[in-house]
């Protein structure tokens, strides 16, 4: 079941048109609705948010501070939905068949589960109600969105084309309440953080502790998926931002990185390792039993390049892993070596359980920072958590 009822999209649409045109009467001309219907939509939306969105004047409607706060994100919701017809190659115009939040949620969940009964249970609906919602969407789109097969519902190309903007629209819609709460002086809601290995061991926990102490009504959810999956979640708004090793500028034009700190990789070994107090060279450790990042990962490529610059072939790993618990367990129980960022195992290094070998790995420096979707409008809570991350990094530097 869904706990929080999203704002009514038709009411949000009416709010935007009245705000843009300055009066209910002018808005009715573009909404093709009776004045009483538009007036009621505004009143119900104000009741939903429990704040006045407009000041009523004899010559029209003027946004209150609350209305000004909500308008930018509300416009982003409609912009995402208004762009769907062009993705489908259909006639332009307002796609009113999309202006029902539960219908959009059903579509997204069907794309995820590909099973109508599962979606019905999730939303507390009957299966015929789910079928009816899908029928309305397919009628508006003018083409099938799913094909029924022995393996369940399979999304069509059209479904895949419109899924991202619909997910973004729903995520923007969810943030309207958070925007309003922030304006009233209290941060509420949920911040979804993509946590890559270089940021999640020390930087992110310290920042979350600081943030939740300051804003106890905000919940933080971390996502530890691989970067490519996090990038997709970032693009659709399911993740607010990603903390970790930044990718090159040419990785994707729609993602923006903010470097906060640079750090070279180090070679770690257990306490008392026989190589700790010897003069080491890359050639001398080339044949060691290595625990290395996975082949093809940015960290592994940097490490391979480091050895290549010294005229050596890439070291052959006994184990490939990015899991810190696995790496730690292997190192403390053997004479294996691991090449990682010091941030990743900072507590083990500080306690002396793991120790750095006196060996530099030139050319392996990586920028650690924040990555966001280009042009996104972050929630106030996400902005505050990113500020805490910047503070923590500044203090730890």
Curated annotation (Swiss-Prot):
| Superkingdom assignment | Bacteria
- Give the UniProt keywords, A-Z: Aromatic hydrocarbons catabolism, DNA-binding, Repeat, Transcription, Transcription regulation
Looking at the record, the residues that make up the HTH lysR-type domain are: 7-64, 99-156
List cellular component terms (GO).
cytosol
Cysteines engaged in disulfide bonds, as pairs = none
Where's the DNA-binding part? 24-43, 116-135
Q: For this chain's UniProt record, which GO biological process terms are given?
A: catabolic process
The terms under GO molecular function for this entry are:
DNA binding; DNA-binding transcription factor activity
- The keyword Protein biosynthesis appears for this protein: no
Give the family per the record: Belongs to the LysR transcriptional regulatory family.
Could you tell me what this protein does? Transcriptional regulator for the galBCD and galTAP operons, encoding genes of the gallate degradation pathway.
Protein name, please?
HTH-type transcriptional regulator GalR
What species was this sequence derived from?
Answer: Pseudomonas putida (strain ATCC 47054 / DSM 6125 / CFBP 8728 / NCIMB 11950 / KT2440)
């Amino acid at each position: 079941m869904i706990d929080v009822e999203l704002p009514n999209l038709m009411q949000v649409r009416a709010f935007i048109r009245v705000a843009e045109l300055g009066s209910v009467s002018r808005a009715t001309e573009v909404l093709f609705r009776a004045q009483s219907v538009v007036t009621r939509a505004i009143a119900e939306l104000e009741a939903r948010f429990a704040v006045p969105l407009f000041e009523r004047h004899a010559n029209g409607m003027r946004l209150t501070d609350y209305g000004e706060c909500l308008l930018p994100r509300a416009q982003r919701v409609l912009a995402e939905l208004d762009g769907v017809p062009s993705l489908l190659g259909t006639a332009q115009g307002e796609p009113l068949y999309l202006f029902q939040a539960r219908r959009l949620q059903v579509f997204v969940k069907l794309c995820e589960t590909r099973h109508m009964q599962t979606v019905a249970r999730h939303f507390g609906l009957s299966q015929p109600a789910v079928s009816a919602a899908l029928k309305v969407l397919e009628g508006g789109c003018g083409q099938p969105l799913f094909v029924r097969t022995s393996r369940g519902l399979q999304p069509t190309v059209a479904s895949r084309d419109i899924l991202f903007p619909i997910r973004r629209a729903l995520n923007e819609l969810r943030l309207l309440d958070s925007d309003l709460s922030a304006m009233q002086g209290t941060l509420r809601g949920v911040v979804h953080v993509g946590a890559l290995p270089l940021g999640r061991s020390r930087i992110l926990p310290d920042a979350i502790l600081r943030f939740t102490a300051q804003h106890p009504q905000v919940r933080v959810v971390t996502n530890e998926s691989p970067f490519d999956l996090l990038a997709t979640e970032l693009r659709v708004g399911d993740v607010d931002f990603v903390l970790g090793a930044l990718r090159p500028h040419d990785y994707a034009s729609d993602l923006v990185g903010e470097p906060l700190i640079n750090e070279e990789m180090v070679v770690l070994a257990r306490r008392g390792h026989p190589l700790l107090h010897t003069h080491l060279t890359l050639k001398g450790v080339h044949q060691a039993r290595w625990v290395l990042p996975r082949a093809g990962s940015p960290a592994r490529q940097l490490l391979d390049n480091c050895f290549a610059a010294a005229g050596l072939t890439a070291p052959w790993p006994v184990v490939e892993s990015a899991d810190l618990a696995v790496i730690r367990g292997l190192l403390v129980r053997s004479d294996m070596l691991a090449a990682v960022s010091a941030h990743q195992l900072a507590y083990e290094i500080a306690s002396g359980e793991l120790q750095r070998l006196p060996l530099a790995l030139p050319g392996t420096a990586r920028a650690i920072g924040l990555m966001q979707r280009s042009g996104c409008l972050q929630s106030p809570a996400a902005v505050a958590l990113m500020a805490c991350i910047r503070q923590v990094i500044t203090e730890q530097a």
